[in-house]
Amino acid sequence: SLSSAASDVYKRQVLKNENLIPISKESKSIVVAGRGADNLGMQCGGWTINWQGGQGDITIGTTILDGIKESVSTETKVIHSKDGTDLGNVSGDLAIVVIGEDPYTEFFGDKDNLDLLEEDIQTINNLKDKGYKVLVLLISGRPMNIADHLDNWDGFAAIWLPGTEGNGVSDILFGDFQSTGKLSYPWPLNAEDGANAPENGLLYNIGFGL
């Protein structure tokens, strides 16, 4: 059911929160940016409609952007900017940036490294350069290399593949439901090390989640 799909999203992990979550529903304005903000296909990942999944409106559902719009006051202006540049003359202090992996299945997901895309990093930097506090939501099927970037982020949540119910994500962001998620495995400093090189250190240990 839709309710059970949304409730599953509440198990995602908030891993860094510098007084951003819960976000006020009465905020004057909120910027929502990133490739994944308005992308159902990216939310769902592989094995969705097609073998490799797809981008955009490949099925019926609620994007994270739409979930945010439904959560806030009618007086709150939600500005959608894919790369964090075209904001017009709107002033504000909070940007929610949805980044992560494109859909994949099986060996198509094999990669030499698990670094963030330069496009995603640039979007975040565009907003930080404008003075915004940035809350990063990472869509992925595995831990990625974020250690070098985390200090630049004011908040971070691993939302994995939330599926069609983007409103489940916004419920957590705006305090309608408390995130109950705890990591079921460690998040390494370098994702390529995984569990095979614990001596290289961990970013987050098993069971972590705010």
Tell me what each language-model feature is.
Residues 157-192:
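Active-site-proximal C-terminal subdomain of hydrolase catalytic domains
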